[in-house]
């Protein structure tokens, strides 16, 4: 099989040296991503495209799908590479491949040609198009906005019959820009902002501030791993987790209620900047959007930025929530985000939207900064590939069931609001309500002689919580997916 990789247009307008560097990096990224699919795979770079050749036909769909998710690729062409001897030979090889697709449709032929030939590209289009029109009675030529476009590429004495065109995600190859550290919470915004920086050519590392216990961290780890595995697996990245509960406790005790949100964000930026400096990362990435919450006004954002010299990138600054959710749905993080607990929003009951620098600094004078230094020093740092290994090892231990036995009970772990809106009723089995955010403290109070089948609407949070309970030593948990 053969694929022709077309470059993102912004790469093609770079200077010769920069363009060659980008193409070289993209070629390496493709090799890194595809090496597990086919050991015989070959990746060859050219000035205006990259070729991927592989022998294992069973891997064709997987290779094609992986290529569409590598930053720097505008689109890929799945081609059949055959020799040709004449214009008529080109037509004869094109007819059987396209006959079925053209029946009852309007079409045109488009040819791209490289090398020296006795004919022009337009002459090939006319000859092949005329032949197809004659031999397929129900087909009709239409040069403007046809139903089907027959794409052919000719390179010296080889004919590339284009069997399919698949759009890539565009952007720059990862590694062409410097590393960044994304402050990831697992919600809609941080996942999308991380993706946008990967698409722009940055290797994205992840920093997670844990405010809600082990279950929250498990969920965020899986979001980070999903993003890396889907769009950035050509490079090794770090996942740094900082236990921020002591910092939150100090803020709740020492800081005025209205200033808590801004002070918390300032502490996060301070901590993330220390992590970035430790690993030589050039910038921080956040999912903040202007005016979305109280801490994201211009005044408050300026005060948050003031605590660090590290550049803070906010790719979503002008996006509205609906658009962000649409992007999350497009890249596949929507389900994760919908079931991710949000802890930051409950820290302050009456937050200020226009903080005063002197007042913020006065409040921070009460804060014990040794606590911040300690949590940064004790931060865990793992290779993101280890998350997959840990998850695979753990997932095997959590059984998913579609029915229930005599000693089983269903545990509805949705939030109270969701349960009131759509109560769960299952005949023949006891249904108990215990929201996910109470599992860590209340699950032990349940009847441990029963097997508890955790249930939520999408199955994401129930699986994460089952993993967490298993880690805590509870073996009587399964995931219920009818």
UniProtKB/Swiss-Prot annotation:
Nucleotide-binding listed as a keyword: yes
THUMP domain residues: 61-165
GO cellular component terms, semicolon-separated: cytosol
Keywords: ATP-binding, Cytoplasm, Disulfide bond, Nucleotide-binding, Redox-active center, RNA-binding, Thiamine biosynthesis, Transferase, tRNA-binding
Catalytic activity reported: [ThiI sulfur-carrier protein]-S-sulfanyl-L-cysteine + a uridine in tRNA + 2 reduced [2Fe-2S]-[ferredoxin] + ATP + H(+) = [ThiI sulfur-carrier protein]-L-cysteine + a 4-thiouridine in tRNA + 2 oxidized [2Fe-2S]-[ferredoxin] + AMP + diphosphate; [ThiS sulfur-carrier protein]-C-terminal Gly-Gly-AMP + S-sulfanyl-L-cysteinyl-[cysteine desulfurase] + AH2 = [ThiS sulfur-carrier protein]-C-terminal-Gly-aminoethanethioate + L-cysteinyl-[cysteine desulfurase] + A + AMP + 2 H(+)
Major location (coarse): cytoplasm
SUPFAM superfamilies attached to this UniProt entry: Adenine nucleotide alpha hydrolases-like, Rhodanese/Cell cycle control phosphatase, THUMP domain-like
Location of this chain's protein in the cell: Cytoplasm
Residues given in the record as ATP binding sites: 183-184, 265, 287, 296
InterPro entries, sorted: Rhodanese-like_dom (IPR001763), Rhodanese-like_dom_sf (IPR036873), Rossmann-like_a/b/a_fold (IPR014729), ThiI_AANH (IPR020536), ThiI_fer (IPR054173), ThiI_N (IPR049961), THII_Thiazole_biosynth_dom (IPR026340), THUMP_dom (IPR004114)
Metabolic or biological pathway, per its Swiss-Prot or TrEMBL entry: Cofactor biosynthesis; thiamine diphosphate biosynthesis
Keyword Metal-binding assigned: no
CDD domains: PPase_ThiI, THUMP_ThiI
Enzyme Commission numbers on file: 2.8.1.4
UniProt domain Rhodanese: residue ranges: 404-482
Protein function: Catalyzes the ATP-dependent transfer of a sulfur to tRNA to produce 4-thiouridine in position 8 of tRNAs, which functions as a near-UV photosensor. Also catalyzes the transfer of sulfur to the sulfur carrier protein ThiS, forming ThiS-thiocarboxylate. This is a step in the synthesis of thiazole, in the thiamine biosynthesis pathway. The sulfur is donated as persulfide by IscS.
Family membership noted in the UniProt record: Belongs to the ThiI family.
Protein name: tRNA sulfurtransferase
Organism: Klebsiella pneumoniae subsp. pneumoniae (strain ATCC 700721 / MGH 78578)
